[in-house]
């Protein structure tokens, strides 16, 4: 893949920011992430965020869908699939959905996987492909001849996986496809029954120039800064030069654990005073809150957390617990209940149940 012209030599410096106070930083962060109620449609939202992280855990709904719901409210989840697999306005790479305009940048990251051995995972992929050249040829030939294919439609012709390299499941066909995917040789062409369909990249992704790895990394830093709105600098905050301050309504919504507003836990604590950890891998007896707890955003403040569980067979959204932050306004209960009701409606739940663990100040509103 050719490098973009004019990108050799010294890469441009990172975009400078402007100093802002903490209150303005919070407003800009919420507005930049479209959590102020201004999001309009799925594609524009993904473009503004830069990417969507994929996670299949569906205690409520998959993370990518909850992230969009937090901004858009009720929306048709089929629209995301349409944008990916029909309109091809989005593409999937490395467990993220990217706007197609970002393909030159992502190809710079693919180049790094092909050329670099700096990180352990990069060395693992290089060694795995070197040891399994014949297996690699077989997979690429089968995709060329019969693709797109599910991973189970390919034979495991590997030499075996060394225990110390166990990295991505236990099936070597999946390991091979993932390795080739990271390097840009194969791509995800769609889904069948929730499973990925694999094909040769040239049959899925359009021809584009590839950025150098260095330029891709620089542009991604700038894109992340723009999407987040603010970053920490020298003990304070600075805003992206394109970020605009403004009022944020007291809109209440629930956030996925993978939401970019709180994905960096240290940043979330510094900006919102909110200490948050996902506890699904913590033994039940050691959990402080619950298995899959969602932060509650009200305006520019994170006022608490809540553990909703969608019981699909029963058609019930159950709130296993809710916890208010010490600074949460006493009148927050109705807004939290409204957010839960909106979530239930979007999920298609027929009713809402509330468990015993809720803040006293919110109890009447949450219990209806």
Question: What is each PLM-predicted segment?
Answer:
Residues 1-368:
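Long, charged, low-complexity, helical-prone intrinsically disordered regions
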């Amino acid at each position: 893949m050719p490098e973009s012209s004019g990108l050799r030599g010294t890469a441009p410096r990172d975009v400078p920011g402007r100093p802002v106070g903490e209150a303005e930083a919070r407003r800009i962060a919420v507005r930049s992430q479209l959590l102020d109620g201004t999001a309009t449609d799925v594609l524009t939202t993904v473009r503004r965020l830069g990417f969507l992280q994929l996670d299949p855990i569906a205690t409520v709904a998959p993370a990518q869908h909850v992230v969009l719901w937090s901004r858009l409210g009720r929306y048709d989840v089929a629209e995301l699939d349409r944008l990916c697999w029909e309109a091809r306005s989005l593409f999937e790479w490395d467990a993220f959905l990217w706007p197609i305009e970002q393909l030159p940048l992502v190809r710079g990251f693919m180049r790094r996987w092909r050329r670099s051995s700096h990180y352990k995972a990069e060395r693992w992929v290089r060694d795995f492909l070197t040891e399994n050249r014949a297996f690699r040829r077989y997979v690429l030939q089968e995709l060329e001849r019969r693709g797109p294919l599910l991973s189970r439609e390919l034979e495991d012709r590997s030499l075996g996986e060394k225990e110390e390299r166990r990295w991505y499941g236990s099936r070597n066909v999946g390991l091979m496809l993932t390795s080739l995917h990271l390097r840009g040789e194969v791509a995800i062409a769609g889904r069948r029954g929730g499973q990925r369909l694999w094909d040769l990249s040239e049959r899925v992704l359009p021809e584009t120039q590839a950025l150098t790895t260095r330029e891709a990394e620089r542009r991604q830093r700038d894109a992340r800064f723009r999407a987040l709105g603010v970053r920490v600098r020298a003990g304070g905050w600075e805003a992206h030069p394109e970020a605009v301050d403004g009022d944020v309504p007291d809109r209440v919504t629930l956030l996925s654990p993978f939401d970019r507003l709180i994905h960096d836990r240290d940043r979330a604590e510094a900006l919102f005073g909110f200490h948050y950890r996902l506890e699904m891998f913590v033994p039940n007896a050691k959990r402080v809150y619950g298995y899959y707890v969602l932060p509650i955003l009200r305006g520019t403040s994170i006022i608490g957390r809540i553990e909703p569980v969608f019981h699909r067979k029963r058609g019930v959204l159950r709130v296993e617990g809710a916890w208010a932050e010490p600074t949460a306004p006493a009148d927050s209960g109705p807004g939290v209940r409204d957010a839960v009701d909106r979530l239930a409606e979007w999920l298609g739940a027929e009713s809402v149940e509330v468990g015993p663990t809720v803040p006293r100040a919110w109890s009447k509103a949450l219990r209806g």
